[in-house]
Structure formats: structure tokens, C-alpha cells
Amino acid sequence: MPKFKPAGWPSVIPRIVTRDLTGLAGFLRDVLDAEGDVRSGAPTEIRIGDSIILISDGGGVRDAMPAFLYVYVENADETYRRAIAAGAESIEAPADTPYGDRRAMVRDTWANVWQIATYRGN
């Protein structure tokens, strides 16, 4: 096990800096079945499936910094509907792609863009 990173963590971890840590964490739990609790004074570790995202408060030294992330889910259509119900803006409605993904795209209230996909095969 490498000693340069925590056990079970990948080498690359996306980080979102937001001005509403609690709101964004709630959105991720409601829409993407994310797990993780907001921690004060430290980045919040959010787990989505087998992946980790760090989210932290903006302000002070860091300005809010949104992300563009591609996320595989069990049902892209249902996840898209949940995102819209949670206040996200539709960028692309669910559609099949030539590379086997059923994919949609939304922008959340905090300006993060989420491509939501389910692989269906070629």
C-alpha cells in the first residue's frame, strides 16, 4: 500500500469549491446517492459509487470553483429527473450516444455541470 496517500483513495480526486457546502452535499446525496457528511474546517469527502469527490467552502483564499464531471449511474433517465426536481437546469435531455452511453447533462444551482450516463453497450 502506498504511503503517500490514504488507503482506498485514487491518485486523482476532483475537488469542488462552493459557497454552499451543505446545499451541494444535499444535492449530491439526493440526486447521485452520494455518501458523506459535511465537516467544518476541512474538505468534505463525498463518495459516489466507487469514486471520491472533495467539496469545500469557498471564500477567503479560495473563490468558488465549479466542476464539469462525467458520472456513471444505474439509470441516467431517473437520475436526470431527480436532478431537475432538485433544481438543476437541463443542458441535454437523456439521449443515446454512438459509443454506447445513454447520457444527459445538467447544471446544478452552484454552476457545476454533470454529465450523467448509463453504459448500454455498443
Where in the sequence are the language-model features?
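Vicinal oxygen chelate
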Residues: 1-7, 11-19, 44-47, 60-122
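Short beta-strand-to-loop elements that line the ligand-binding cleft
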Residues: 14-16, 37-39, 93-96
